[in-house]
Amino acid sequence: MQVEYEQESGTFIPPSAKTVNDLLDEYMSIYGVNTWAMSTYESRKSLIANYIRPLIGDMKLEDVTPRIMDKYYRDLLSVKAVSSKYVKARTEYLTPHTVREVHKTLRNAFNQAVKWELMTRNPVEHATLPKEEHKTRDIWTAEVLQKALEACDDDILRLAINLAFSCSLRMGELLGLTWDCVDISPASIELGQASIFVEKELQRVNREAMADLDGKDIMFKFPPTFASTH
């Protein structure tokens, strides 16, 4: 880790945040860019920009208390959900699930603040959070899959459906699948060891997040002309 290396080498500059906004700036630049994957960085940056900075960003760290944070989490349920350029908000107001995602981000940020000796304790360590209803997802049965395959007249789509079902591939993994991930050699088939091993996935990534992370973990980027026409 870069932070640990700088601490050991004596080149680490301790954070000096005074407000929640200051803390978030240093949390993102010191912790986030070195720890999070691209998709995590982008989603947490969005949560911070839309639901944390506008509401409590100007608060001084010394004024952030458990009581204030409990009220903040409660009030978030009446905040309108923000749509992004590519993803439309599914509900009018924030759901308990999103509030819990905000809490995870703040809990981690305040933990770093305690570690950096900017706060004496984490004000959300024992926070009261809205209850989240867990809904069971509808899962295709083998019969439904068979009907879908029979109704599909596109060979590539039929193959994608088969792979997604038989290999439990997520959409990004399915779209990132290349021949180097596949082992169907005669020897592997004979031994019953034919396999698919996916270590990459296709994602739509915000250019700003890509720049912030200096292209970390990106294996291939489509040319702008391709991205704008497909």
PLM region spans:
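Short, basic/aromatic-rich helical patch in the C-terminal catalytic core of site-specific tyrosine
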Residues: 69, 106-110, 174
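N-terminal DNA-binding module of tyrosine recombinases/phage integrases
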Residues: 1-71
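Conserved tyrosine-mediated DNA breakage-rejoining catalytic core shared by Y-recombinases
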Residues: 126-129, 138, 143-146, 177-230
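Alpha-helix C-caps/helix-loop-beta hinges
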Residues: 58, 79, 109-112, 116
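Basic, Lys/Arg- and aromatic-enriched nucleic-acid-binding interface segment
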Residues: 82-85, 89-96, 100-102, 115, ...
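Short, conserved phosphate-binding/catalytic loop or strand-edge motifs used
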Residues: 62-77, 125-130
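Charged catalytic carboxylate motif
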Residues: 23, 47, 68, 101, ...
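Short, amphipathic alpha-helical segments that act as regulatory/interfacial helices
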Residues: 4, 48-49, 103-114, 161-165
